[in-house]
Amino acid sequence: MYTDRKFQAYPDAKVYVVPYEEFQKMDLNDTETKHTCGQWVNLWEWPSIEAFHNHCALLHYRYERIPPRIIATSDMPAFFMKNFKLRPEFFEINQNLSRCHTEAYEFWAETQMEHFKGDEEKVRLDIDSFWDNHLGSYDDVEDFADSVESDPVRYELDVDVTGMTKEEMLASEEFMSCFIYGGEYNYFFKKPNW
């Protein structure tokens, strides 16, 4: 069991788990009924989706062949859920991303979700994809262009900006379309292969 919560991205995250057989009987449109057939499970205790599923199998020993379903979450972004199941990337992010980077990660994930709406299989939530695309936080686009001008190789953009001035970059449609930015602290990311 993993217990070092202070370094986790979502230390208070938990999910309400119900056995699959009970889930099949539920009317999910009925928001009035309080479901009591499940149990809240703290996610900070589990280092992987496998460990989480093993724990859930122990809670509902008769139903261990089919993973349980999750009908409620607390203190975690909704994009970690898919078809009433927890995405395995949650555990990787929770164990390996600091709390100070969660806002940037959430902006990046939500931007992908919006872009790939209807084709969510293309969305990448793993930590390696996050860091591969993360460019930093800047005051504005001009500040970002200044930084790229001073060290173009560092950013590994899909556009060759070697020798370009800040003004040339800002006037270049290719440069302006190779990144996305936003969020509370102006997070900049390479545009995934859109």
Language model regions located:
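N-terminal ordered "arm"
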Residues: 1-59
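Acidic, proline/glycine-rich low-complexity IDRs
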Residues: 3-13, 29, 149-194
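Intrinsically disordered, low-complexity coil segments
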Residues: 23-36, 64, 115-122, 168
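Intrinsically disordered, low-complexity segments enriched in small/polar residues
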Residues: 36, 116, 134, 161, ...
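A residue-identity detector for tryptophan
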Residues: 40, 44-46, 108, 131, ...
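Mixed-charge (acidic/basic) macromolecular-recognition segments
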Residues: 53-151
